[in-house]
């Protein structure tokens, strides 16, 4: 059996303090119906909570005096965990989607790529438009700029340009974000 070195504290408790773990000598007590019972000694409040068959849970430790409520600890922790999971689930992380184009793109291909860009923007994602130059196409940088300006014009109602077109090696990049 492993023993804790002399003088070291026990493992810190996760979650709210309850019953004998409440360190404050006096607490403001709220019963199971939400009624304020006033400020009383922690021991007295714990006894009242046990009479009702509940625990005394510290819900606001930073208040003066701390606020404690008559609750079922297991149920309280479960509800808090459920609330945290729901908040994490509903939180939308904004992703950067990438669409690759060519300087000499045909109209139908362009329309297909534009539909995808619009779909990404409506979903709330940023879109990185990459225009790749091959071989001698590098000599015709203005063609790439025209395609980028066309994308910019076609998305101006639903998006704003976050990063204007710029060359990076053999490719031209632009980032558009939803408005």
UniProtKB/Swiss-Prot annotation:
InterPro entries: T_IF-3_C_sf, T_IF-3_N_sf, Translation_initiation_fac_3, Translation_initiation_fac_3_C, Translation_initiation_fac_3_N
Subcellular location: Cytoplasm
Keyword Protein transport found: no
Single GO MF annotation: translation initiation factor activity
Protein biosynthesis among keywords: yes
GO CC list: cytosol; membrane
Pfam families membership: IF3_C, IF3_N
Superkingdom of this protein's organism: Bacteria
Keyword field: Cytoplasm, Initiation factor, Protein biosynthesis
Main localization, broad class: cytoplasm
Swiss-Prot/TrEMBL GO biological process terms: ribosome disassembly
Protein role: IF-3 binds to the 30S ribosomal subunit and shifts the equilibrium between 70S ribosomes and their 50S and 30S subunits in favor of the free subunits, thus enhancing the availability of 30S subunits on which protein synthesis initiation begins.
NCBIfam families: infC
Self-association and partners: Monomer.
Family: Belongs to the IF-3 family.
HAMAP family xrefs: IF_3 (MF_00080)
Name of the protein in its database record: Translation initiation factor IF-3
Native source species: Zymomonas mobilis subsp. mobilis (strain ATCC 31821 / ZM4 / CP4)
Gene label: infC
């Amino acid at each position: 059996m492993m023993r804790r070195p002399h003088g070291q504290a026990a493992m810190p408790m996760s979650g709210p303090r309850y019953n004998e773990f409440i360190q404050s000598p006096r607490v403001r007590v709220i019963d199971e119906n939400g009624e304020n019972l006033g400020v009383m000694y922690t021991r007295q409040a714990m006894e009242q909570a046990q009479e009702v068959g509940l625990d005394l849970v510290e819900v606001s430790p930073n208040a003066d005096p701390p606020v404690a409520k008559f609750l079922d600890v297991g149920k309280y922790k479960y509800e808090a965990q459920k609330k945290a999971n729901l908040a994490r689930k509903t939180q939308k992380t904004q992703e950067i989607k990438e669409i690759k184009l060519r300087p000499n793109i045909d109209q139908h291909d362009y329309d297909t790529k534009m539909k995808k860009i619009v779909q990404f923007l409506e979903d709330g994602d940023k879109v990185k438009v990459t225009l790749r130059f091959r071989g001698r196409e590098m000599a015709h940088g203005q063609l790439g700029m025209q395609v980028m300006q066309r994308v910019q014009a076609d998305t101006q109602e639903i998006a704003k340009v976050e990063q204007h077109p710029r060359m990076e090696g053999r490719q031209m990049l632009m980032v558009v974000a939803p408005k």
